[in-house]
Amino acid sequence: MKTYKPYRHQLRRSLFASTIFPVFMVMIIGLISFYAIYIWVEHRTIHQHTYQTQTELQRIDKHFHTFVTQQQKQWRHVDLSHPTDITKMKRQLLKQVHQQPAILYYDLKGSSQSFTNNYEQLDTTKMYLISKYRIDFKDDTYILKIYMSSTPLLKNIKKNSGQSALIVDSYDTVLYTNDDRFSIGQKYQPPQFGFMNESLKLNSHHAHLIIYKDIHETIEDGIALLVVMGVVLILLVIFGYISADRMAKRQSEDIEAIVRKIDDAKNRHLGSYEPLKKHSELEEINNYIYDLFESNEQLIQSIEQTERRLRDIQLKEIERQFQPHFLFNTMQTIQYLIPLSPKVAQTVIQQLSQMLRYSLRTASHTVKLAEELSYIQQYVAIQNIRFDDMIQLYIDAPEDVQHQTIGKMMLQPLVENAIKHGRGSEPLKITIRIRLTKRKLHILVHDNGIGMSPSHLERVRQSLHHDVFDTTHLGLNHLHNRAIIQYGTYARLHIFSRSHQGTLMCYQIPLV
């Protein structure tokens, strides 16, 4: 066999030309790219944080403006000289303050008395005055002021991004800050270099919100990181150069032998084990080729068992996705019912616990049809509490059919889809009809809801064949994919609908 010395010389020259020089260029480009990307990312996050903060503060201002406007007529009959009216007024203001995502204080001041939730007597001159209203009560005219001490959003921006916030008036006087470099009442002068900032208008009084960042705080660390990366890359190139030279010198014959054995293994003509001429790390590859060839038959035999396990894992994964939006809405309903109707809230909690126990049961992914129908009835019962009994459920399933076994939670997505996409201003009637024919279960779910246009219906049908989690119709998509995993191509799901005439879903599955 020919010597590989010329190849080693060529490899040495190639490594020097194609590795050393590119590494140097990568360091230069990396330094420039790091700075450019850093500036771009910071500008983007500052813009995003400025917009989020502006939206939050304006929403709070709008909320109190709407609240005061709606209550002014009623407040004209309120006499704040009476303790009962005082207590009622305090509760109203505290409720509005506590509903906002910020630490707020109100100050209601008249000619002879005042009310506030600033029990710690904090200095309100260091807070941002969100809004101010003149309100006429029965006994006197009062001035209502709403102050903001801080918000979780601004704290998180300061903590996580190192960005500071200012609120200034039309004369650039600082009204609010969370940075020690500025103080309330001083004039704001934008730094000339090393700072990035963005400003947005807050209200009609020309107050502006400013979010800014000192780029000197992190640019030095970034440069140091690039220097370290450059040194590491240079060391790796040197090590790779030496290793490649030795491999070209010592392992050429063994590489060719390995290539020949790979070709023999592809054609299933590989004989008994033969070690390489030189003992090296390539011997691991040589051993692996023989081990792979010997285990090929065992691998083929285990494929079928592995596929079954994979299907079980996929089924369990889909079952664990218990409608987080439904659970969230139900918990909100319970929270609303607890002070109004504790007994109803207790009933909802019991129904929800039974549904969770049913959906999270891992002993088997198949259940009796009667259990599935009971689960659906509980689901609709909870939905009726949310929607004021606007859903009517009718089940037409013979007794012998209810003893059949189906996949757990195979019907619930159909009912959920009917409620979510079919409910309108009129009562929604959902009919479930189940029949058994020739070892197949035929399930029809019909609703008299708003239906779908032809184009919308076509999009829904196409969404059944999209990847899981890649569609807005997750319930039907999960159901379709799960049915294929569990029953193969024998499962069928057809959807028919007309605008303002309801929707019909026909579901056919083989019996387990």
From Swiss-Prot:
Entries under InterPro entries matching the protein: Bact_2-comp_sensor_kinase, HATPase_C_sf, Sig_transdc_His_kin_internal, YpdA-like_HATPase
Enzyme class: transferase
The record's account of how the chain is modified after translation: Autophosphorylated.
Record GO cellular component, one term: plasma membrane
Catalytic activity: ATP + protein L-histidine = ADP + protein N-phospho-L-histidine
Residue ranges occupied by any Histidine kinase domain in the UniProt entry: 297-512
Protein's membrane topology: Multi-pass membrane protein
Cell compartment(s), UniProt: Cell membrane
Transmembrane segments: 20-40, 222-242
Modified residue annotations for Phosphohistidine: H325
UniProt-listed Enzyme Commission number(s): 2.7.13.3
Function: Probable member of the two-component regulatory system SERP2405/SERP2406. May activate SERP2406 by phosphorylation.
PANTHER family: SENSOR HISTIDINE KINASE YPDA (PTHR34220), SENSOR PROTEIN KINASE HPTS (PTHR34220:SF11)
Name assigned to this protein: Uncharacterized sensor-like histidine kinase SERP2405
Species this protein is from: Staphylococcus epidermidis (strain ATCC 35984 / DSM 28319 / BCRC 17069 / CCUG 31568 / BM 3577 / RP62A)
